[in-house]
């Protein structure tokens, strides 16, 4: 460093300049300004060698300054004598009296924000903990401030409630309390364990047909079976194909054996290390300290099997139940390998891709906390955060980049300082979702750009084993690690099903009412299938104290829910994958999902990491097939399955109360519309001012490019939505939310054709000609029936 060079160049009898001398007062400030914010917490050699003398060094500085001032005053301002006296007390460059000169970042202050001794004391209460993501948000006042939303619907509701408090609404509140008490009694009396003849039961381990209903005979059973065949939901393409391992195609099984690494290799790696604890995995001390500070004392099964294999650099395809610690399973080996990286030249070596930005934020939080005792740098690149801030972080070439596919491609194409040629590890979290059609184009663009010699790891709770999909990722003899059977829920999860009789599907909110006021379920997480399907319901639930899940750093419903300010969190399938929200005891499916895979992800938001939880599903007659699949999977693992019956009269009372909110909701929506218009006008005015003020800078910016057109992006979005929610959701728009029997039969036949890989079904001549076999058959039979009539007429 500069001080040591000055000591060698100057003679012994001359005074020595130090960093605290007045003749060079700006050296420290310049060094602090040039150090980037991302590197501020990085320990260095100086910090490691300073030790406990840092505190003493500061005290000695003050004493030196005091002595220097006293001597200079006594000598009439002779600075040289003061400096010579100061030099006599210095024992060495890094001695006890010169331990911390202020020109370094202390190793004991690398955790920003405090919290506890290790900065992680509040980990259990923080949940997502995306404070680092907030730093990248640019608001009206610049970087580091939160984005101010244009219109806050919850604030409008609060204002209306405050106005009504002064108008004598105490009587209404008393009536609501009485209704709440009635609902609790009925709810407790109707709880019963799901019987063999209940809705969704009667499914033996080896059977897949429709059995008898609650009280029906043979006639009722035939009608129910016919209704089931007409109104069954569309399954995921891989749902039926992978439902039973015994029915798998022999050819596909042979391809898997050739594609995946031999199971013996995986088992041998697991047996070599004592995997009952993290200490037996030969992990470095900084990694062990990070695991201990977070509260990880014993590896989960997926962690015990994955970490040793990932440390060897092999490709991994991993699957385990929700809440089993899959994130730490790939973060820990990544951190361990990065500890031995060359540090002279900063290089981006790891890329983690997630399907949603909320999951990316959570993964970033977990990784930064596990790496809190290391010098590994992370960057979060997701939509909704400032591009400029992210470009600045990527310019420093962080070790790990956690991103969503769209924003990663944006930086890859338009950020000149961001290079991906040195990436050594690629991780796809929730890989089965990433391999769907909605992400196909983006994932292909990323995979063709990254180096082919990389290590690739795929993880999901419903991991696909289809070789055709996995080949796209470019895996090289991956180790297949499936800890639990696929589509399996946690053992500590109790599953409840509320049956909606035919004709009562429109009164779902009435059946949901008792749960809104049930004190047993004061912390509930509502997952709705799609926003369009429940467009009026979010407003009703807001009046009941619920929040709709949006970007957490904007509206922060997760923080309000976690802090107990609200009791309900309304969310779509966007939040059904991967998110670990603290405090969720109950998950309520307002509508049954389209497939068992989505059901497993939804109910996996509770009963995580060994905790207990409850999953409640409001199931109508068209949901029978999914319910039976869920019940069968639950029975196979010994889970508790309950059938809950809510009296129709009570549901009607709740529905009437909810319908009374319609007028108030219309007024709220009108007020929201007016505020949105005002916010839009303000934004346009601000935009015009910026165009005039920064015209030259705006025109000087290079135009951002994309690898596909807007039409291609729209098609990809529609494909992703269709695969997530099923084709049935798109066809509902034709019949105002209802499907005709003809459309239902078309969808069922399409679902059967999608199962051709396992059943061996092939298109016939009629299908190849573009006409269905049934339609072609009708054309053939018509001439035969009309021919005799024509001959009689001629005679």
From Swiss-Prot:
Q: Write out the biased-composition intervals (Acidic residues).
A: 21-34, 78-90, 98-108, 172-195, 204-225, 240-252
Q: Motif DEAD box: where?
A: 429-432
Task: Specify residue ranges for compositional bias: Basic and acidic residues.
Answer: 710-721, 740-756
Main subcellular localization, coarse class?
Answer: nucleus
- Tell me which Gene Ontology terms the entry assigns under biological process: gene expression; ribosome biogenesis
Query: Where along the sequence does the record place the motif called Q motif?
Result: 276-304
Q: Quick one: signal sequence residues?
A: none
| Keyword presence, Magnesium | no
Record keywords: ATP-binding, Helicase, Hydrolase, Nucleotide-binding, Nucleus, Ribosome biogenesis, RNA-binding
One Gene Ontology cellular component annotation held by this UniProt entry = nucleolus
Q: Which domain of life is it from?
A: Eukaryota
> Would the keyword Nucleus be found if you checked this record's keyword annotation?
yes
**Domain called Helicase ATP-binding: residue spans:** 307-481
Q: Which InterPro entries match?
A: DEAD/DEAH_box_helicase_dom, DEAD_box_RNA_helicase, Helicase_ATP-bd, Helicase_C-like, P-loop_NTPase, RNA-helicase_DEAD-box_CS, RNA_helicase_DEAD_Q_motif
Q: Name one GO molecular function term.
A: RNA binding
Subcellular location field: Nucleus, Nucleolus
Pfam families registered for this protein in UniProt: DEAD (PF00270), Helicase_C (PF00271)
Positions of disulphide bridges = none
* Region annotation (Disordered) ranges: 1-127, 162-276, 703-795
Q: What is its EC number?
A: 3.6.4.13
Q: Where is the composition biased (Basic residues)?
A: 56-70, 779-795
The annotated subunit structure for this chain is: Associates with pre-ribosomal particles.
Q: What does this protein do?
A: ATP-binding RNA helicase involved in ribosome assembly.
Q: Which family does the entry's similarity section mention?
A: Belongs to the DEAD box helicase family. DDX27/DRS1 subfamily.
Q: What is known of its domains?
A: The Q motif is unique to and characteristic of the DEAD box family of RNA helicases and controls ATP binding and hydrolysis.
What protein is this chain from?
Answer: ATP-dependent RNA helicase DRS1
**Organism from which the protein derives:** Chaetomium globosum (strain ATCC 6205 / CBS 148.51 / DSM 1962 / NBRC 6347 / NRRL 1970)
């Amino acid at each position: 460093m500069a001080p040591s060079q000055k000591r060698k160049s100057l003679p012994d009898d001359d005074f020595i300049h130090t960093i605290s001398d007045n003749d060079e007062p700006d050296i420290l400030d310049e060094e602090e300004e040039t150090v980037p914010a991302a590197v501020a917490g990085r320990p260095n050699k100086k910090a490691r060698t300073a030790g406990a003398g840092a505190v003493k060094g500061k005290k000695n500085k003050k004493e030196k300054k005091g002595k220097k001032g006293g001597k200079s005053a006594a000598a009439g301002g002779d600075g040289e004598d003061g400096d010579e006296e100061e030099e006599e007390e210095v024992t060495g460059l890094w001695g006890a009296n010169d331990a911390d000169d202020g020109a370094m970042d202390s190793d004991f202050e690398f955790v920003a924000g405090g919290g506890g001794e290790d900065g992680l004391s509040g980990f259990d209460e923080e949940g997502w903990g995306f404070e680092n993501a907030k730093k990248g948000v640019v608001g009206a006042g610049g970087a580091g401030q939160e984005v101010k939303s244009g219109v806050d619907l919850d604030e409008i509701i609060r204002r209306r409630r405050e106005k009504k408090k002064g108008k004598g609404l105490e009587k209404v509140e008393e009536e609501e309390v009485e209704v709440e008490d009635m609902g609790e009694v009925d709810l407790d009396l109707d709880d019963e364990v799901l019987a063999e003849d209940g809705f969704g039961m009667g499914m033996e381990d080896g059977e897949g047909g429709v059995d008898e209903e609650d009280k029906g005979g043979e006639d009722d059973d035939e009608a129910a079976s016919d209704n089931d065949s007409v109104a069954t939901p569309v399954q995921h393409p891989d749902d039926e194909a992978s439902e039973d391992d015994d029915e798998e195609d022999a050819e596909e099984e042979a391809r898997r054996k050739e594609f995946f690494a031999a199971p013996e290799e995986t088992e041998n790696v697991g047996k070599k290390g004592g995997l009952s604890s993290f200490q037996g995995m030969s992990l470095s001390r900084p990694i062990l300290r990070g695991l201990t500070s977070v509260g990880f004392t014993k590896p989960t099964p997926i962690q015990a099997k994955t970490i040793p294999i990932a440390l060897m650099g092999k490709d991994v395809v991993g699957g385990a139940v929700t809440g089993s610690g899959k994130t730490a399973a790939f973060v820990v080996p990544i951190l361990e390998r990065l500890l031995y990286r060359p540090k002279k030249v900063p290089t981006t070596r790891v890329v983690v891709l997630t399907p949603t930005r909320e999951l990316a934020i959570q993964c970033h939080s977990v990784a930064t906390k596990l790496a809190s005792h290391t010098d590994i740098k992370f960057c979060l690149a997701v939509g909704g955060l400032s591009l400029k801030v992210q470009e600045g972080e990527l310019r420093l070439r962080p070790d790990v980049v956690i991103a969503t596919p769209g924003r990663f491609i944006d930086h890859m194409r338009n950020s000149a300082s961001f290079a991906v040629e040195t990436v050594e590890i690629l991780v796809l979290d929730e890989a089965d979702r990433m391999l769907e059609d909605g992400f196909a184009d983006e994932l292909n663009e990323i995979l063709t750009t990254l180096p082919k010699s990389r290590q690739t790891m795929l993880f999901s709770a419903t991991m696909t084993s289809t070789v055709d999909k996995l080949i796209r990722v470019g895996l090289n003899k991956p180790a297949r690690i499936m800890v639990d059977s696929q589509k399996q829920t946690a053992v500590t999860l109790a599953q409840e099903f509320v049956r909606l009789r035919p004709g009562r599907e429109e009164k779902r909110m009435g059946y949901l009412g008792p749960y809104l006021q049930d004190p047993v379920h004061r912390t509930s997480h509502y997952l709705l299938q799609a926003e369009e399907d429940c467009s009026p319901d979010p407003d009703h639930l807001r009046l009941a104290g619920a929040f709709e899940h949006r970007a957490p750093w904007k509206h922060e419903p997760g923080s309000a829910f976690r802090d107990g300010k609200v009791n309900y969190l309304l969310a779509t399938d966007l939040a059904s994958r991967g998110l670990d929200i603290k405090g969720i005891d109950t998950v309520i499916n307002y509508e049954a999902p389209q497939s068992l895979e989505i059901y497993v992800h939804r109910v996996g938001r509770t009963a995580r990491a060994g905790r207990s939880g409850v999953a409640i599903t409001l199931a109508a007659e068209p949901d029978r097939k999914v319910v039976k699949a869920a019940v069968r999977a639950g029975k196979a693992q010994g889970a508790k399955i309950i059938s809950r019956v809510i009296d129709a009269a009570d549901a009607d009372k709740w529905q009437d109360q909810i319908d009374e909110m319609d007028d108030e909701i219309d007024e709220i929506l009108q007020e929201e519309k007016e505020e949105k218009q005002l916010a839009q006008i303000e934004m346009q005015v601000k935009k015009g001012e910026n165009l005039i003020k920064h015209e030259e800078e705006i025109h000087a910016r290079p135009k951002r490019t994309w690898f596909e057109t807007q039409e291609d992006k729209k098609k990809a979005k529609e494909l992703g939505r269709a695969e997530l929610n099923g084709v049935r959701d798109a066809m509902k728009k034709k019949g105002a939310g209802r499907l005709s029997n003809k459309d239902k039969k078309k969808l069922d036949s399409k679902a059967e054709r999608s199962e051709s890989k396992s059943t061996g079904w092939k298109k016939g001549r009629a299908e190849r000609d573009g006409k269905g076999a049934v339609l072609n058959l009708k054309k053939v039979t018509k001439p035969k029936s009309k021919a005799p009539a024509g001959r009689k007429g001629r005679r």
